[in-house]
A protein has these predicted regions:
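Short aromatic/hydrophobic "clamp" motif used to bind/position activated sugar donors
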Residues: 83
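A short, conserved alpha-helix in the catalytic core of glycosyltransferases
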Residues: 145-150, 154-159, 163-191
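Glycine-rich, basic loop-to-helix element that forms the pyrophosphate-binding segment
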Residues: 60-78
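Short beta-strand/loop segment that forms part of the nucleotide-sugar
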Residues: 32-41, 59-61
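Short, flexible, basic/aromatic active-site loop/helix in glycosyltransferases
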Residues: 122-147
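A conserved acidic beta->alpha catalytic loop
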Residues: 27, 36-47
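Short, well-formed alpha-helical segments that are part of the catalytic scaffolds
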Residues: 12-30
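Conserved donor NDP-sugar-binding/catalytic core segment of glycosyltransferases
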Residues: 90-125
């Protein structure tokens, strides 16, 4: 099944990330649904976002519960088959989502990931390097957590391990995906600008 604007929700976990999140939200097509999980009790911040942006739902966790809990809360609130986990310190290129939509129709996947426009595959072990320069996607064992698209139907309820506060929660998720025999891909030509670790 192909990812589209109608069956995708973008989930962003923040903690008072006002300085960076607006650049992120401004880079997202306003027609795409967005869920913001603010890991604090600052309702003024989330209200500003709701007042300014379309198709956005904001929730306050009350305190910093970590990335795993925040992402799981966003996934639980989402109503679409696909979710895109996105850090607030990322900026999508103009064609990032379109390239994800196009490539997704030819792949059976649990997780897809665009890459940073500064990346040249330094953190990925490509499983089959044959003709990799000509391919638009590669199967890998894991992807970085700042941007990943998840097919919720490939999971048995459990997504991120809530006992992992941050940094390794995406590695654990990818490991469990591979143990189930599901596939993870990176998309070479779907790129984003990752500014740095400014989420929680």
């Amino acid at each position: 099944m192909q990812i589209t604007k109608d069956n995708l929700t973008i989930i962003i976990v923040t903690i008072k990330s006002e300085k960076v999140i607006e650049k992120c939200l401004n880079s997202i097509d306003p027609k795409v649904k967005k869920i913001i999980i603010e890991n604090s009790s600052d309702e003024n911040f989330t209200q500003k976002l709701k007042d300014k942006y379309q198709n956005i739902d904001c929730y306050n966790s009350g305190k910093n519960l970590g990335m795993g809990v925040g992402n799981n809360l966003g996934i639980k609130k989402s109503k679409t088959r696909y979710v895109m986990i996105l850090n607030p310190d990322t900026i999508l290129n103009n064609d990032t989502l379109d390239k994800i939509f196009k490539i997704s129709k030819s792949l059976d996947f649990a997780i897809l990931s665009p890459i940073s426009d500064k990346d040249n595959f330094p953190n990925y072990k490509i499983k089959n390097k044959t003709n990799y320069l000509e391919k638009d996607f590669f199967e890998v064992d894991q992807v970085d957590g700042y941007s990943m698209v998840i097919d919720k139907t490939k999971f048995d309820e459990k997504f991120f391990d809530e006992n992992i506060f941050m940094y390794l929660e995406n590695d654990d998720l990818c490991l469990r995906v591979k143990k189930k025999g599901e596939k993870i891909f990176i998309l070479k030509n779907a790129k984003i600008n990752h500014l740095g670790a400014k989420a929680v």
